[in-house]
Amino acid sequence: MGGLMFILGIFVSILICGWKGMMAGDFEHLYIFFFALIFGGIGFLDDFEKVKHKQNLGLTAIQKFLLQLAAAVAFLCLMRFEGMLTPNLYVPFFNTQIVMSWWVYMVFAAFVIVGTVNAVNITDGIDGLAGSVTVPVGLFFTVLAIWWQGYEQLGIYAAALVGGILGFLIYNFHPAKV
């Protein structure tokens, strides 16, 4: 249930901060939000299967991996189709970029996305661990997005995520109350 509060908070911040851009036809922030919803839907499906079968086994590891990989590849293809993605890997703070072929970049980016999602998912079972690790990462993305020109709205979304996590962490440290 806590995830619903994160979703609501970020969606409200997208609507408030991104309204002007959406009126001008800029939907890139909604793409990111819907991508996150798809991954949340995979997690919900996994939990639903556990409840439905009244056992601790939801989706199999291969089912989860294939769904996550399909979602990551679909997202990357959408971002490329919309012209919001280049095969360049930017190294923050060093003003350096690594140029890759599209195929190498897509494999690398899909690996990073699926790996990150699973890393957070693994830590989510331990009281407060996922949130306490995600807060500094979210703060880093907030600062990075604001530092780079043109990405301020993504910084606001990252800050909204951090705020939601901090509010939830109060109840999620050991012993977790939710």
Question: Where would I find each of the regions flagged by the language model?
Answer:
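"…together with the soluble PPM/PP2C metallo-phosphatase catalytic core" -> "…together
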Residues: 1-178
